[in-house]
Amino acid sequence: MKKNIIAGCLFSLFSLSALAAIPAGNDATTKPDLYYLKNEQAIDSLKLLPPPPEVGSIQFLNDQAMYEKGRMLRNTERGKQAQADADLAAGGVATAFSGAFGYPITEKDSPELYKLLTNMIEDAGDLATRSAKEHYMRIRPFAFYGTETCNTKDQKKLSTNGSYPSGHTSIGWATALVLAEVNPANQDAILERGYQLGQSRVICGYHWQSDVDAARIVGSAAVATLHSDPAFQAQLAKAKQEFAQKSQK
């Protein structure tokens, strides 16, 4: 009898663990304006990604080399772009892609596309990265070296937030993939902009190169998951229709 009880308890424990693969946090049930997906729908980045490079490994030496390369760019025009790219809040992600997309992506000029991008931002930036970030709690470059980033606005808050994978990069790459689907004629410029958003995190000192590389995988997986969500599908269709109408003018 005792064995059956213990076995039942263990089964319940492991079943709950399997269901709770993604750590608890905000999702579509708590912030529907920033998420399409619920916790249980999200990809598990901890299972998807390999561990981050260990200090002293060849991969980490590459991270350090890329950090130094990025640091040397901070006083250049590319460095200024990295500083601006650090702020993706309050429509910042839409603004970042407006040039590559071909016209302003704003709530006024393209409301359906703007809603699509702002509503998916944390599906890619938070939900898709959460399990790996919280498990590894990798130290960020600026904290590792005890230096400042190129944009110190979020430095204190992010000093206690895991570096691997990069949430900003996941947002940028996921956004680029979706925008390239809406406007395939500009896909090269859009994808290049999405790639550079990730590199801006290395230049700024907020992330290691391996954080950024991993985040592009996570961002791609997040977009694949979003395409199975009816609410996302509906808003994507509206954005495509809006774009088609604007293109005819």
Curated annotation (Swiss-Prot):
Its main location: periplasm. It is found in: Periplasm. Its EC number is 3.1.3.2. The keyword Hydrolase applies. It catalyses: a phosphate monoester + H2O = an alcohol + phosphate. InterPro entries: Acid_Pase_classA_bac, Acid_Pase_classA_bac_CS, Acid_Phosphatase_PhoC, P_Acid_Pase_2/haloperoxi_sf, P_Acid_Pase_2/haloperoxidase. GO terms for molecular function: acid phosphatase activity. GO terms for cellular component: outer membrane-bounded periplasmic space. PROSITE patterns: ACID_PHOSPH_CL_A. Residues 1-20 form the signal peptide. SUPFAM superfamilies: Acid phosphatase/Vanadium-dependent haloperoxidase (SSF48317). Belongs to the class A bacterial acid phosphatase family. Homotetramer. This is Major phosphate-irrepressible acid phosphatase. The gene is phoC.
